[in-house]
Amino acid sequence: MPVYRIRGVDVDFPYDAYDCQITYMDRVLESLQQGKNALLESPTGTGKTLCLLCSALAWRRTFGEFLRGGGGGGGGGGGGGGGGSQQPPYGSQPSGSQHSGGSASQSSRYPVIIYASRTHSQLRQVIKELKATSYRPKMAVLGSREQMCIHEEVSKLRGRQQNNACHYLCKKRWCRHHNSVAEFMRNNSELGSEACDIEDLVNIGRTKGPCPYYISRELSKSVDILFAPYNYLIDPGNRRSLNGIPWDNAVLIFDEAHNLESICADAASFDLLPNNLSSCIAEAQECIQLCSAKRTFENSADKQFDPENYAILKALLMALEKKISEVVIDSKELGHTKPGNYIYEFLSELNITSETSKKLIDTIDGASLLLEEGNSAETGPGMKAKATVCRLETIRDILDIIFRGGGQSHAKYYRFHVNECQQNSGDALKVLGKVSRTLSWWCFNPGLAMEEFLKLGVRSIILTSGTLSPLDSLALELNLEFPVRLENPHVIASDQIWVGVVPVGPSGHPLNSSYRTRETLKYKQELGITIVNFARIVPDGLLVFFPSYSMMDKCINCWKDRNHENSSDEHTIWQRICKHKQPVIEPRQSSNFPNAIEDYAAKLRDSSTTGAIFFAVCRGKVSEGLDFADRAGRAVIVTGMPFATPTDPKVRLKRDYLDKLGSASNKNSKALTGEEWYVQQAARAVNQAVGRVIRHRHDYGAIIYCDERFVWQNYQSQMSYWLRPYIKCYKKYGEVVQGLTRFFRDKVSIDSSKPNETDFNDNIVLLADKHKPQETISALAVTTANENQRTALSVNPTTKRSNYIKFAQITPANRSTLSMKHGCSSTSQLLYSGDKLSTDAQVIDLAADVATSHLAGYRFKSLGPKKAKVMVGSKDVCFDDGSPKLQHNVESRALAGCLGEQSTASSKKSNITHAPGNSGAIHEKSGGQESNAGPAFLKLAREKLSTAEYRDFVEYMKALKLKTMHIKDSLDAIAKLFSSPERLPLLEGFRVFVPKNHLSLYEQLVQSYTVPNT
């Protein structure tokens, strides 16, 4: 296993690392060593999770060996540390630490790594990656009771019902699983020393008996690394429940952090819905009755069961309901808005202040226990646990948010808002004649949640994702300094991706999904016909993302409506789409989503069809976290920018808040405007959607932006950094069809590792080994057989030289694993020989793509508006219906006859043959047959050119015939292709095929490539 020394730390990595992976680990170590926050963007497939784990754990090991046996272990040794440059252990214990037993003094000396991701399934993948490394830290993974409860009855419940039932049974010691945790932990002190996920803990519970949920809580008190979902850390209530975690000097890593700011803002906000408030009033009344009954039957004088307390609580809630209903709302669209600190004035009229809120919270806590006991009065050790929900806990959470820390300074980041709710016809409140209103207190500074971590004394906060861009706005939103930043390139070659902006459809009508045009019939039809053609060109799986569910429904309904068809075609647009791909539509209801995924998988497996098409929405479930690798996602179409509804009160107030904040800030300080935030939120959703395809090193696919607004530089600058070099804006739809068809024709022809079946596991499509670098370059990435050409792993010209110099300073600590026989030459420039780096060996250039770089910058002309077909390869590709027609002898005719009367070959009647004894020389023989000239020249070209170069040459010839490429660009490309010394016979011999009126131009090009510069 290779070991890389980066910033003085020896990092064990399970495979030979790509240069971009070394760069990533370098930034992680910079953040950890210097105690700075970091924003790290690296595309999916570049192994960021593996890099995070290896670099962070290598840094942690410099403080001492990993914990063993309930926190015991190495005792401050070197543990594979990095020598004198390593940091010393901390000299003092964290003030907020809570450790148990003898492990406290030792483990508190070392920083704990807390690794958070959005979902349990994502954490499962992270732990799987940990198992692939050589690191074996003491670890724990936190999960909810829904994932971990094994009690026969409680496991069937959900949410607060499950939590309350669990609390009650544990309090009564009626849960045998909870009762056996302490003894199990004493007898299994090594638990956590090997990587184990939630499923492993559940299996232990089912076979051995102890509760997996409480095992994980015990393990979390003394660990090297802790895995947890976002909400466990960001939500104040959940964070309070994590007793024993040493926050001081801890490292927080947020993976998949592209939505972190919205999660933070939502955690600090609340919406008090009218039905929730009514339920709270009903629960307060129930508490009164329970207390009265308890006093009567038990003759108890316990103040905790004083019904007067709950009568006061009920009266307060009813007064709050009445006060909300009396708020004057002038406009249903705008609602009633006040500055954030108005909430204190509003509540003070009900005698709810910072002081009285503490008593209210105590009363609500008592009510929660009372309701648990009351609803479980008949429950015994062998009886079912009853489901209970304490809505009053919602009021408790609201009071915590409003009176956090006992101060009011945070209110300046909020807006107070009251608005009328949409009512159903059977709404109980409407029947009672009450006004149905929602009281909201919205936080517009996501940085408040991050501030809490700083107060806890964390050392570094690392945010990473494949789609963090734009980084500046994210840093401004979170109100944190992020001195360490990275926008990594991808590890794929440039011929593995096609990115195009399609501004118009087949008829030339603009594609623009803005509110001005998206409702028009012409736009919907043009978009539909555009998708029909892409459904035919793209093999296997195709994803189509709409800005919203509403827009998706309207377009699909339009395509299905035969009355909207204004052509002679007997089929609707929807039927024509289904002719090429079997459709699946993302459901609005989350409960139906697994069925949609299974349906898509089944249709992909169906060998009688040409694939499936998944219609989905940006910010929906398809766009978040699913892995459409290989056949599951060969292309993604984005039909427009998913802007939030501008009239939505929360969106409108957020924009207004940012604009006012910017106008009040110092002119020298950077501030985010409301408009910038509005655009960037949409752009980030698009970036997340397009990230569903091209999921690993050998994957390939196309990204198609079907909206003319993506041509704008303002929009392109918001796209992920790694994607920008590949973007090409087309003017004509024919150019798009030509380029896309050629891309997939070339990829399919060399794809020798096509999966035979589709595997959907844990809602992840076509699972691929995302991080394991390959020793050799896949056939998907190789475009030439020329041994002198280097195959690129990414295109990033601006960083080529700087990366080479930087990586030359990083020496591999494990030299033997990086020798030539171990394949290092195929991954990086870290070739070690003695005490010096060797750069003589063959290396892969990470910054240039020689195989296709000569195509960049050429301008393609459009076909005429009346031309219904474009020539691509050896096929006629129609824009719409009709089977492709093979053309015989295309290559020969491209030379011998395609230029017609303009060719000098037709006037000279000459042919080209090889001169005996002079390999490669070309002579003209007057009086020869013109028909022999083309095949003879092609034969020589095949001998002199690589496979990819020969293919490019034929394409240039077709461009000359069809006039789809400017003549100067075509001739320049051909002359450049023939310019090497061994190909000069081709350069000279091609003269006979140049049109007469461009012969002088070709002569100039020949001279420029053959006359040496002086």
Curated annotation (Swiss-Prot):
Top-rank taxon, per record: Eukaryota
Compositionally skewed regions (Gly residues) per UniProt: 70-85
UniProt region (Disordered), positions on chain: 70-106, 906-930
Annotated InterPro entries: ATP-dep_Helicase_C, DinG/Rad3-like, Helic_SF1/SF2_ATP-bd_DinG/Rad3, Helicase-like_DEXD_c2, Helicase_ATP-bd, HHD_RTEL1, P-loop_NTPase, RAD3-like_helicase_DEAD
Short sequence motif named DEAH box, residue ranges: 255-258
Residue sites binding [4Fe-4S] cluster per the record: 149, 170, 175, 211
EC assignment: 5.6.2.-
The keyword Iron-sulfur appears for this protein: yes
Record's subcellular location: Nucleus
GO cellular component: nucleus
One annotated GO biological process: negative regulation of DNA recombination
Main location: nucleus
Family annotation (CDD domains): DEAHc_FancJ, HN_RTEL1, SF2_C_XPD
Comp. bias regions, Low complexity: 86-106
Recorded catalytic activity of this chain's protein: ATP + H2O = ADP + phosphate + H(+)
GO molecular function: 4 iron, 4 sulfur cluster binding; ATP binding; ATP hydrolysis activity; DNA binding; DNA helicase activity; DNA polymerase binding; metal ion binding
Amino acids binding ATP: 42-49
Keywords per UniProt: 4Fe-4S, ATP-binding, DNA damage, DNA repair, DNA replication, DNA-binding, Helicase, Hydrolase, Iron, Iron-sulfur, Isomerase, Metal-binding, Nucleotide-binding, Nucleus
Protein's job: A probable ATP-dependent DNA helicase implicated in DNA replication, DNA repair and the maintenance of genomic stability. Acts as an anti-recombinase to counteract toxic recombination and limit crossover during meiosis. Regulates meiotic recombination and crossover homeostasis by physically dissociating strand invasion events and thereby promotes noncrossover repair by meiotic synthesis dependent strand annealing (SDSA) as well as disassembly of D loop recombination intermediates.
Family annotation (PANTHER family): DNA REPAIR DEAD HELICASE RAD3/XP-D SUBFAMILY MEMBER, REGULATOR OF TELOMERE ELONGATION HELICASE 1
Similarity remark: Belongs to the helicase family. RAD3/XPD subfamily.
Name used for this protein in its record: Regulator of telomere elongation helicase 1 homolog
Organism: Oryza sativa subsp. japonica
Record lineage: Eukaryota, Viridiplantae, Streptophyta, Embryophyta, Tracheophyta
Gene: RTEL1
